[in-house]
Amino acid sequence: MAAPARDPPGYRYAAAILPTGSILSTIEVASHRRLFDFFAAVRSDENSLYDVEFDALLGSYCNTLSLVRFLELGLSVACVCTKFPELAYMNEGRVQFEVHQPLIARDGPHPVEQPVHNYMTKVIDRRALNAAFSLATEAIALLTGEALDGTGISLHRQLRAIQQLARNVQAVLGAFERGTADQMLHVLLEKAPPLALLLPMQRYLDNGRLATRVARATLVAELKRSFCDTSFFLGKAGHRREAIEAWLVDLTTATQPSVAVPRLTHADTRGRPVDGVLVTTAAIKQRLLQSFLKVEDTEADVPVTYGEMVLNGANLVTALVMGKAVRSLDDVGRHLLDMQEEQLEANRETLDELESAPQTTRVRADLVAIGDRLVFLEALERRIYAATNVPYPLVGAMDLTFVLPLGLFNPAMERFAAHAGDLVPAPGHPEPRAFPPRQLFFWGKDHQVLRLSMENAVGTVCHPSLMNIDAAVGGVNHDPVEAANPYGAYVAAPAGPGADMQQRFLNAWRQRLAHGRVRWVAECQMTAEQFMQPDNANLALELHPAFDFFAGVADVELPGGEVPPAGPGAIQATWRVVNGNLPLALCPVAFRDARGLELGVGRHAMAPATIAAVRGAFEDRSYPAVFYLLQAAIHGNEHVFCALARLVTQCITSYWNNTRCAAFVNDYSLVSYIVTYLGGDLPEECMAVYRDLVAHVEALAQLVDDFTLPGPELGGQAQAELNHLMRDPALLPPLVWDCDGLMRHAALDRHRDCRIDAGGHEPVYAAACNVATADFNRNDGRLLHNTQARAADAADDRPHRPADWTVHHKIYYYVLVPAFSRGRCCTAGVRFDRVYATLQNMVVPEIAPGEECPSDPVTDPAHPLHPANLVANTVKRMFHNGRVVVDGPAMLTLQVLAHNMAERTTALLCSAAPDAGANTASTANMRIFDGALHAGVLLMAPQHLDHTIQNGEYFYVLPVHALFAGADHVANAPNFPPALRDLARDVPLVPPALGANYFSSIRQPVVQHARESAAGENALTYALMAGYFKMSPVALYHQLKTGLHPGFGFTVVRQDRFVTENVLFSERASEAYFLGQLQVARHETGGGVNFTLTQPRGNVDLGVGYTAVAATGTVRNPVTDMGNLPQNFYLGRGAPPLLDNAAAVYLRNAVVAGNRLGPAQPLPVFGCAQVPRRAGMDHGQDAVCEFIATPVATDINYFRRPCNPRGRAAGGVYAGDKEGDVIALMYDHGQSDPARPFAATANPWASQRFSYGDLLYNGAYHLNGASPVLSPCFKFFTAADITAKHRCLERLIVETGSAVSTATAASDVQFKRPPGCRELVEDPCGLFQEAYPITCASDPALLRSARDGEAHARETHFTQYLIYDASPLKGLSL
């Protein structure tokens, strides 16, 4: 039934109020009132009629209002808007451009150029806007009148329903208004390349192409520089007006003008056309207006009429012709088809309408002058996006990766200070800045000074992944190798008598040794620069800080035969055991000495007199040979020593008086006995030398405890034994007189699989040997074990002395002896039959009862050493030749030797598996082989020129280790091959039956360090002692926690996210915007009706180049805390654990207990552990720091500029055009690093395939939870990601170049933002494969000098270094 007649007819009562103001306000107000009048006046109970009317009116209203609001925005400057009702029916739309190439008329012999016309087509990009609202069933009933009952309440409810509908419709219309602006802003952003990309492309393109690799390399270098310079420029420039104006000029002149010159355009109030629009955030706009830009006008005239699309027949015609808006096909014909005048007369009305004055209105605008251009400055953040859940497109995010060098060591020319009074320590204290740095200071968010120390790396290196090398061994053996010279990589089983071992070795290996220096010797003589050269063929085998990779004999179980069998080779790996075995090129001598100097501060130091006395003995080429015979005769036996105490005292005193040197310092047993028993018999100065030696040994032993944390026994061994090699019973002293060490070696846990080979036999311990039972030609496993006075019923199969006795012996021989001898001494076997024969071959003149013992061998004929009593080849003659004065009673004590004798020198080969702290599935089958001599002696300075004693008469050279293989001793031994004499000076000739370099606990780098060190004996002993700390997860935990430098540094990688404020500039009329007919869809539901509104849109770029450009203006705020949170691998899936469960549990609990990333409890059964949620957060999301093991010799200058954390360039920045160039660039170290052509890499432990860093962070191995989400290093190590980024950068350069070049109609060209721009803006470090250094220093004083802006602040101070910021954030205050 019809509504009551009291309602006013039509729309009179609302429309009668005439609107005032501009045309835009008139349209808006009229639209609102007309819609309200319709709902207030129409009453009907026919739903279909209401639906039809409602749909039609709603569509008209939305079109009008959305266009009106859009024109008020600065975005409309960049658009040519055209109504196109039939857009929804269009299959494909194209726009054609005719581009005229400019010519220059020239004189001279140049060919005459003809005009060139290029044609370009572009395809319309289809889009749509959608919105929806719903009407409840009851509201529909009220609107149609079905629910009216004639009461006033029902009429009030109807009015409320009408008002609510109007509010819903207004909200939808508001969505369309904002959606139009948002859609156009996204359209402009999609075609706007970054300024950092566009500027270099325009400068370096040659006819739109990069003709050569050189041009591309130049372009990429400029691209990286441009990105750092132009990013965040408004924030970095501060108040420098000229710099910001120049940056804005670059921004507004980098684009190409539109080919469209529309008749209707924006202009200021004086009629000057607006050249473009600059869209940014409210904060940047306000700053530009306040400080840098001059407002030319506050109002603008904008058009309010648009072109329209019409259909005539089956053809769809563009609305843009010669840059003007058209209304019909007649205008198209006039401009395109050149129709006759009579044809145009029929459309005169249309043409008159076209030529009429444009309809414009005046709106509020900020028009500014940038250079010679008039620009509409716009900020839509508050006007469009406020109170919506849609982020502002010009507020983005950027991820930047930073790199920090931790624990590196300055090269020699960088270890200096400006003058002595600069940054001096407190009086009386050592200079800590001369020690190797172990920490790093930098600024975090809010200018916090943060610290990173090596302790923070425990979550990375104190993890079983350190020992997981199965993938590396399998990878490097992919191609066959040849074991050309296996010396040093092959261990033979001892066989036969020890006296012939050296000669048999030389005879069997002569041909192999004659090939020249072996790898492990040559590497020790390289500098860091030489080692990193691409021509170093063995660089490919330096993959891991804790393992040696080498070419050995394949499929041979060690120990093997006397010589390796012929056959193929294989790349093998052995645990390096201690950090002293790191190559000298990567851990140089200067670093080791500096570390030793640091450890010696505040600890025991030998007196200069002690050093002079001991050094003099080791360098004395006239050292009395009879002392060696006495040493062998005593054979470490405490009872024999006490029996010969008078003779020993006189020998020591006589030698001291002659030379001021200390005798018997080549045998620690004798040194210890002398301190214990001869305190009152020797001169005080002489006795002080021996006491000082023992005290120093004890101090070095205490050093281990200083750097070991308390903890439970693991694998049956104390923590100190797992931490330091000298405390590990698996290593024997090179010279042993008793069998205590052998018994403790055999008593180790069964998992260490300890074995001892005594001359090819199992050891058998014997307690007594005298002249009646001695067998000097014995060839079995019998070993004498009676060096201490003991009970008669004491067992022979257990140690007699505490473990410290063996430990002190090892420290003395492996630390003090190399520090004094510098590798010139040599171990030797003893011919005991000749020794005893000589010592017993003497006649002592009888002294009558009551007479005093003769004291002067020169004047007293009764003295046994009087010339009249000397006989050739007797012990008396040897005393005389050595100028040693002893009396008759002392010589008579030699008779006791017949009751306690040694039989022979036995070569021992001991083997053991890694300890519980290093035993994993990868290392379980590895064996370490070390040699030792039972009943051998240590020869000090060579005496081969002394012909009073036949060389080899009493001792035969038998080097047990490279530290004790002096070249002069070895090369001058009887029957030494002359062809090997020169080789012996470089290569330590140790028989394979006593070990091999790659299988020894102590290897050639330690030997070379002792030879080359310029440090004094005190510092060198501490340096050597520091080099014997182990490299295992458990050992490194102790060292890092207690502040010991582990011998290698770290590259710290951290990724931070920053919220950025961006700037967009677009040329005038650079985008055609097509608006289709609004469509309303109705969907019935149980509770009402849903209305979905859809309007098709389309757009096409109107330029023959880039007409828009974007730039990152400043940082709004960092999202992350820019902090020092260390990574914890125990949160990931992890490598195979330690085989000893107790050790695995202890290590995990110890690392997690002190780590801020410790897993939350309880631990999940499956998947990764979760990070505990803390109660609060202040500076932002935690940024995780990851650690890449790096040699301390890595050039610190590598980190002063953007660099790849792997140590070698990667990705499309440097790669060539060939297939596989990207992979070759990453892993082929036979080629130089393109970023540093003078080297192949800065870190071979991370840049090579299957290296330690590669195994940790390369996602291809699926280890330790390495993922782009959890790991900032992932993108630098994963080849698939790097290849993808390479292709991305290639495409970015190619497509940007083709866009700037002349295009033809052969293909549809859209000048869109090239693929890869998003990566360039959001993750430039991944795209460039470079991380940026930030301001950091190993010394806080250097950091403060950089903060205070000190002019020419130095970058180094002794071993400390300062790195300046070289990132895009340089100059920003965060």
From Swiss-Prot:
Superkingdom of the organism of origin: Viruses
Location (main, coarse): virion
Keyword Nucleotide-binding attached: no
Pfam families: Herpes_MCP (PF03122)
Record's subcellular location: Virion; Host nucleus
Keywords: Capsid protein, Host nucleus, T=16 icosahedral capsid protein, Virion
InterPro entries in the cross-refs: Herpes_MCP (IPR000912), Herpes_MCP_upper_sf (IPR023233)
GO molecular function terms listed in the Swiss-Prot or TrEMBL record: structural molecule activity
GO cellular component, one term: T=16 icosahedral viral capsid
Family: Belongs to the herpesviridae major capsid protein family.
Physiological role: Self-assembles to form an icosahedral capsid with a T=16 symmetry, about 200 nm in diameter, and consisting of 150 hexons and 12 pentons (total of 162 capsomers). Hexons form the edges and faces of the capsid and are each composed of six MCP molecules. In contrast, one penton is found at each of the 12 vertices. Eleven of the pentons are MCP pentamers, while the last vertex is occupied by the portal complex.
Subunit structure: Homomultimer. Makes the hexons and eleven out of twelve pentons. Interacts with triplex proteins 1/TRX1 and 2/TRX2; adjacent capsomers are linked together in groups of three by triplexes, heterotrimeric complexes composed of one molecule of TRX1 and two molecules of TRX2. Interacts with scaffold protein; this interaction allows efficient MCP transport to the host nucleus. Interacts with capsid vertex component 2/CVC2. Interacts with the small capsomere-interacting protein/SCP.
Name assigned to this protein: Major capsid protein
Organism of origin: Human herpesvirus 2 (strain HG52) (HHV-2)
Name of the gene this protein is made from: MCP
